[in-house]
From Swiss-Prot:
Soluble frizzled-related proteins (sFRPS) function as modulators of Wnt signaling through direct interaction with Wnts. They have a role in regulating cell growth and differentiation in specific cell types. SFRP1 decreases intracellular beta-catenin levels. Has antiproliferative effects on vascular cells, in vitro and in vivo, and can induce, in vivo, an angiogenic response. In vascular cell cycle, delays the G1 phase and entry into the S phase. In kidney development, inhibits tubule formation and bud growth in metanephroi. Inhibits WNT1/WNT4-mediated TCF-dependent transcription. One of its GO terms (biological process) is dorsal/ventral axis specification. Residues 53-169 form the FZ domain. This is Secreted frizzled-related protein 1. Induction: Down-regulated in colorectal and breast tumors. Up-regulated in uterine leiomyomas under high estrogenic conditions. Expression, in leiomyomal cells, also increased both under hypoxic and serum deprivation conditions. It comes from Homo sapiens. Glycans are attached at N173. Its main location: secreted.
Length: 314
């Protein structure tokens, strides 16, 4: 990650500030020196005339801000560049993006998102380069569409600078370095079997079911999943009267593999969300009580409280 000028792919720090962003960010000093940051900027949310109840502050990035805790620097500014004024709001809004980050759709996803959700402490706001936004969008939106999401208006790339100092990861012409080492597996089926990751998927989903599957067939470019037995863990938008005739869809999944569906003799943990009239599968795991991580998930699920703010995607 670095601060660069987007024109001609040049990178550099044209800022007379001191801040350490680690080896990946151009060296500019220690963030711990800043307890208060006063932004004098003519771009972004500070131009909007919005009244903030508190002046901008430089604060520690908390461990439970999972999206940005390991981004490479330790302090961030509040309000952030998405106009979130409190850490509670930042954590709740950022949690929507953690499952996407885990999909590794682009090498610059975390750098791009954290430059907005958890901007580094400088004497004025520095936005991500437009080309970085476009590269992340072009790589990640196809993955998002498997989950029924599109690139949100709040991250529209033409809002970000082209010819000014901006947050960069690699030069714009180094596209080969930013391409993900991806897989052909349907993204909702490509899940890490870690209790924390399952909890994150649960919170990002609207409903969760323990399910036995009757059959899977292709329909209009999707995989259509017909349940045999189901027990709700989290109903969300599903009405009890509709459970009997519930059908799920793996969006755009007709031709990508989902290895969990190769053997339907198991019970599954199915998570999803409703998009228009369809119930979309957003994550699937074999229901395996013998697995240590799955057992941990079951314990955590009983007491875990998911974020309550409305999703940034809606």
């Amino acid at each position: 990650m670095g601060i660069g000028r987007s024109e001609g792919g040049r990178r550099g720090a044209a800022l007379g500030v001191l801040l350490a962003l680690g080896a990946a960010l151009l060296a500019v000093g220690s963030a711990s020196e800043y307890d208060y940051v006063s932004f004098q900027s003519d771009i972004g949310p500070y131009q909007s005339g919005r009244f903030y109840t508190k002046p901008p502050q430089c604060v520690d990035i908390p461990a439970d801000l999972r999206l940005c805790h390991n981004v490479g620097y330790k302090k961030m500014v509040l309000p952030n560049l998405l106009e979130h004024e409190t850490m509670a709001e930042v954590k709740q809004q950022a949690s929507s993006w953690v499952p996407l980050l885990n999909k590794n759709c682009h090498a610059g996803t975390q750098v791009f998102l954290c430059s907005l959700f958890a901007p580094v402490c400088l004497d004025r706001p520095i936005y991500p380069c437009r080309w970085l936004c476009e590269a992340v969008r072009d790589s990640c939106e196809p993955v998002m569409q498997f989950f029924g999401f599109y690139w949100p208006e709040m991250l529209k790339c033409d809002k970000f600078p082209e010819g000014d100092v901006c947050i960069a990861m690699t030069p714009p012409n180094a596209t080969e370095a930013s391409k993900p080492q991806g897989t052909t597996v349907c993204p909702p089926c490509d899940n890490e079997l870690k209790s924390e990751a399952i909890i994150e998927h649960l919170c990002a989903s609207e409903f969760a079911l323990r399910m036995k599957i009757k059959e899977v067939k292709k329909e209009n470019g999707d995989k259509k999943i017909v349940p045999k037995k189901k027990k709700p863990l989290k109903l969300g938008p599903i009405k009890k009267k509709d459970l009997k005739k519930l059908v799920l869809y793996l969006k755009n999944g007709a031709d990508c593999p989902c290895h969990q569906l190769d053997n339907l003799s198991h019970h599954f943990l199915i998570m999803g969300r409703k998009v228009k009239s369809q119930y979309l599968l957003t994550a699937i795991h074999k229901w395996d009580k013998k697995n240590k991580e799955f057992k941990n998930f079951m314990k955590k699920m009983k007491n875990h409280e998911c974020p309550t703010f409305q999703s940034v995607f809606k």
